[in-house]
Amino acid sequence: MLEIGFCTLEDQCPYLKDKRSRIEYKYIENCPKEINNELIKRGWRRFGRYFSRPICKDCDECLSLRILVNEYHFSRSERRVINKNINTKVILRMPNLSNEHLFLYDKYHRFMEEKKDWKRYDLSFKQYCNLYVDGFMNFGYELAFYIEDKLVCVDLIDILEDGISSIYCFYDPDFSYFSLGKFSLLNEIQIAKKMNLDYIYLGYFVKKCQSLSYKADYTPSEILKGTKELFENEILWEK
């Protein structure tokens, strides 16, 4: 296993316009599942072979959140979402890369650029591969959702020893009736329940960021308190 650590310079925060951000990275070649799991439990996120976490000065708004799978019960509205997708085909497979993926990714981000003023970047095949395909090892997967043989949603996940790490999800906004973003997360919870996994690691909850504040709706959940290194065993998650 090769590991290289580095940090970015301070820059504009992508979540809060009045804040500055700084990110710590680990590049890990051939990362074992157990190391991935230990990093995720400590608040890191994986994209390709890179793991990252915020180390922002005078700000702790990015809070790592995980859903408690064993205590989670689907609400009436969530069951309606599941029922609406009774004919949606769901495939769990290794991360894929195709023209369909890039077209859907671009369509989703064009929509979010208009709806939520997201910054949009045109990804090449290589860039998508670096972010979402590389480094999947024996834990990285995608949930691919099809409606009438059309790829309408991709949900990238890691299936770890104690839970599922939710990496990134994008979907076709023309199929908004099906609530595909929510449906993909409900599928993660269903898979975790079937595999007897304890958690869904949802990444960062930021209360003042509309794109990330929704995560608080999924309860019961826990928030990671503080940051810990791999050699530190005292990891504290609180409801």
Curated annotation (Swiss-Prot):
Keyword terms of this UniProt record: Acyltransferase, Cytoplasm, Transferase
GO cellular component: cytoplasm
GO-annotated molecular function: arginyl-tRNA--protein transferase activity; leucyl-tRNA--protein transferase activity
Compartmental location: Cytoplasm
Domain of life the protein comes from: Bacteria
InterPro entries recorded: Acyl_CoA_acyltransferase (IPR016181), Asp_Glu_LeuTrfase (IPR017138), N-end_Aminoacyl_Trfase (IPR030700), N-end_Aminoacyl_Trfase_C (IPR007472), N-end_Aminoacyl_Trfase_N (IPR007471)
The EC number(s) this enzyme carries: 2.3.2.29
Protein family according to the UniProt entry: Belongs to the R-transferase family. Bpt subfamily.
Function: Functions in the N-end rule pathway of protein degradation where it conjugates Leu from its aminoacyl-tRNA to the N-termini of proteins containing an N-terminal aspartate or glutamate.
Protein name, entry field: Aspartate/glutamate leucyltransferase
Source organism of this protein record: Campylobacter jejuni subsp. doylei (strain ATCC BAA-1458 / RM4099 / 269.97)
Gene: bpt
